[in-house]
Regions:
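Solvent-exposed loop/turn segments connecting transmembrane beta-strands
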Residues: 1-11, 45
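A generic beta-sheet turn/junction motif
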Residues: 5-9, 18-19, 112-116
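Structured loops at beta-to-helix junctions and adjacent beta-edge loops in soluble globular domains
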Residues: 5-6, 29, 70, 122-124
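Short alpha-helical segments and helix-capping/turn motifs at coil-helix boundaries
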Residues: 8-10, 50-51, 103-106
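Structural motif
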Residues: 9-11, 32, 118
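Residues on the lipid-exposed face of transmembrane beta-strands in outer-membrane beta-barrel proteins
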Residues: 12-16, 53-57, 108-112, 148
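Periplasmic-side early beta-strands and strand-to-turn transitions of outer-membrane beta-barrels
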Residues: 17-99
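Flexible loop and strand-edge segments within Gram-negative outer membrane beta-barrel domains
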Residues: 64-113, 119, 125-147
């Protein structure tokens, strides 16, 4: 297992065996940009989280299966409670939406080695959900202020 503390995020990863014929890799990362951006007075506060995994199983020397996945969550809030509400920050807040995005991909590949030939069967599924929300003057108290 290995951990990483970066300038804008923290993460952990691990890999190894899950038995005699199976191996794994996994990692997770999360940003703390929202705290840094708040400290330096920026009007938006982004946060991201992502994770990935891979599992590989060898049935025998001629057949193997690999399953993998990745996913991410992006979340950007507006820093409307700033002490320094400069004209520049007011302008940025006037047009920036709140952003919420989720995405993932899952996949698998089955490989069969036959002499000099390789046969593969591959399946995958991906999805992205993207939601941007903007209220006039960032006032969420009235539904009619919703503009995006």
């Amino acid at each position: 297992m290995r951990g990483v503390l970066g300038a804008s995020d923290i993460g952990v990863s691990a890999n190894g065996p899950l038995g005699k014929k199976t191996t794994y890799q996994v990692s997770v990362r999360r940003s703390y940009l929202q705290f840094l951006f708040d400290m330096i007075g920026l009007p938006f506060l982004p946060t991201f989280t992502d994770a990935q995994f891979k599992i590989k199983h060898s049935f025998n020397p001629k057949n193997e299966l690999t399953v993998l996945g990745l996913g991410a969550i992006d979340d950007m809030k507006l820093n409307t409670g700033m002490e320094d509400m400069s004209e520049k920050n007011q302008y940025i807040l006037s047009y920036l939406p709140v952003v919420k995005q989720k995405t993932y991909t899952l996949g698998a590949v089955y490989k069969h080695y036959a002499g000099k030939n390789l046969y593969s069967v591959i399946i995958s599924r991906s999805q992205t959900n993207n939601k941007n929300i903007k209220y006039k003057d960032n006032d969420e108290s009235k539904e009619e202020n919703l503009s995006l």
